[in-house]
Amino acid sequence: MAWSQSADLNLLGNQHFSKGFYTEAFQCYAQALEVDRKNGDQRALATTLGNLGNICAVSGRREQARAYYTEVLELQKILGEDRGISTTLANLGNLSADAGEWARARAYYLEALDIMNMLSDYAGKAVLLTDLGLVARETGQEVEALAFYQESLVLMRRVGNEAGQADVFRMMGRLYLNQHRLDEAQSCTLTSLDVARRLKDELRMGGAWYVLASCHEARGEWQKAIQYLQKVVQVDEKYQLPKLAENTQRLQALLTRVGASSGVPHE
């Protein structure tokens, strides 16, 4: 009975999470955690703690997420859940990457990759390769990053992960943007946007719009950059994303710049 209650709460939390309603998702997971702690079911507890780690990670509560993931990892090692261990290692790598701890992130990712290769976990590996691509990009290894992204895209197609394909194309767009290869950056990002629209995935659409705004800004096409960034801020506001304030400030700076160049003050 307790397991069923925990499972139902986690399912409801997952539904909220998938829609970007993070506060409601956290509340469901927190209730499930109370049930699991009382019940003593280690597998159910590991699932709930993992979900709490995920929600804290996307909400910018990095240290809280790290604590949840660390407890999950201990439970998974006790239970011998190799697939779960690889996922949690990747999640810990993501937290390190978010903090700019690139060497630590890479170490977590490579440990996870070893397990995924052992398990022939192509779906997990496809995502992990994008993580390794991010580390390579941020540490100046852009050729290696592109190779990771291209290998990931092959696997994403193999396992039918369309959302993942949208992510990879957006990441390739950002990489090309960093290299000032603006045509390639825009092409990849528009492909990402097309996939996200087909999936009706507003969060991924927002991610693509953000890169497109940067592409147009790099070209000096301020009005187009503003149009895309306004869409980004709308998504940030709807889902209360962590970069709302930063993106709003960037939008205001662009509006001010356009107003100044046209001689018309912006209210």
Question: Where would I find each of the regions flagged by the language model?
Answer:
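Conserved alpha-helical positions within TPR/SEL1-like repeat arrays
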Residues: 7-20, 26-27, 34, 43-58, ...
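Short coil/turn linkers that connect adjacent helices within long alpha-helical scaffolds
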Residues: 19, 37-41, 75-81, 115-121, ...
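Long, contiguous interaction/recruitment modules in multidomain scaffold/adaptor proteins
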Residues: 1-2
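TPR/TPR-like (Sel1-like) alpha-helical repeat modules
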Residues: 220-241
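Alpha-helical linker/edge segments of TPR/alpha-solenoid repeat scaffolds
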Residues: 53, 214, 218, 251-267
